[in-house]
Amino acid sequence: MIDRIWFGHSRLYLLLLPFSWLYGLITWLIRLSYRSGLRVAWRSPIPIVVVGNLTVGGNGKTPIVIWLVEQLKKRGLQVGVVSRGYSGKSGKYPLILSHHTQPEEAGDEPVVIFQRTGVPVAVAPKRKEAIRALLKKHPLDLLIADDGLQHYALKRDFELVVIDGIRRFGNACLLPAGPMRENITRLHSVDAIIINGGEAQKEEILMQLRPSQAVNLVTGEKKPVEELISVIAMAGIGHPDRFFMMLAQLGVNIIKTQIFSDHQHYTLSTLLPLAKKTQSLCMTEKDAVKCKAFAQPNWWYLPVSADFPFVQSQKLLASIEALCHRIC
């Protein structure tokens, strides 16, 4: 229902507009309090690159964070990542991730980032606490704040916004009448805009998600995803249809799709009935990190990586690297 209101042609959003006006006023007052000096944002001793959204839901931030980390490491920088750790509940914050950290503690996205990159990752409701914890243990040159665009308590040196190139801004209304966390005019003040799929407009950088081979959750075996038989596709992400469309474009024989809520908590009893032993259950990497403890031999996940035009990507990386040299 909410997707039809935000991204369809339903006029039910009109009923929610008064609440959106109130939300807009509150967010404007928060930003104003920092700009006027009534509230003081915390400045990290090393550069902060924020990767965030203007809209609610899965726009593809995690693959971009992973790409940034990998590319900046190749340039010789020591990089760390901080996050709110949404959906995770730890007994103590800040939490620095290790190979034993579970998604239930840190959230699924920080765990994926840590497992894919191996760089220091910390989560805390207050990002400055996560940053301080990392800097006590690691000599870092630069930090990436995952989903921190609206966290104005943290000063940032570079803002990167990710937009779903297919759905873009929906009806362009603020929450709850629409998907917007902030007004579209916020784009005028950011440093880079990345479009996930679709067609890039002026000043936007086009990103494509490139799938690799499917990975078995139990054995680690890899094979082309189109070789999986009788596939039941499931996704608990912000935009599950993107995952299903990717599988279809790869020629996967999809028998059924199953959508779960974003950041869904999974159990064996929930997933076991979805696919028979003669079928393949295929999921996203973000879902997979929450299912490995009870995975079955016919469960697979499909990792994806961000891919950018060479010239634009090098310009983006050079801008971020220059920040570090200037501040450090």
From Swiss-Prot:
Pathway this chain belongs to: Glycolipid biosynthesis; lipid IV(A) biosynthesis; lipid IV(A) from (3R)-3-hydroxytetradecanoyl-[acyl-carrier-protein] and UDP-N-acetyl-alpha-D-glucosamine: step 6/6
Record-level GO cellular component terms: plasma membrane
EC top class, as a word: transferase
Gene Ontology MF term list: ATP binding; tetraacyldisaccharide 4'-kinase activity
EC assignment: 2.7.1.130
Pfam families: LpxK
InterPro entries: LpxK, P-loop_NTPase
Catalytic activity: a lipid A disaccharide + ATP = a lipid IVA + ADP + H(+)
Positions of ATP binding: 55-62
Biological process according to GO: lipid A biosynthetic process; lipopolysaccharide core region biosynthetic process
Protein keywords: ATP-binding, Kinase, Lipid A biosynthesis, Lipid biosynthesis, Lipid metabolism, Nucleotide-binding, Transferase
Function: Transfers the gamma-phosphate of ATP to the 4'-position of a tetraacyldisaccharide 1-phosphate intermediate (termed DS-1-P) to form tetraacyldisaccharide 1,4'-bis-phosphate (lipid IVA).
Family label: Belongs to the LpxK family.
NCBIfam families linked to this entry: lpxK
Name of the protein: Tetraacyldisaccharide 4'-kinase
Annotated source species: Hamiltonella defensa subsp. Acyrthosiphon pisum (strain 5AT)
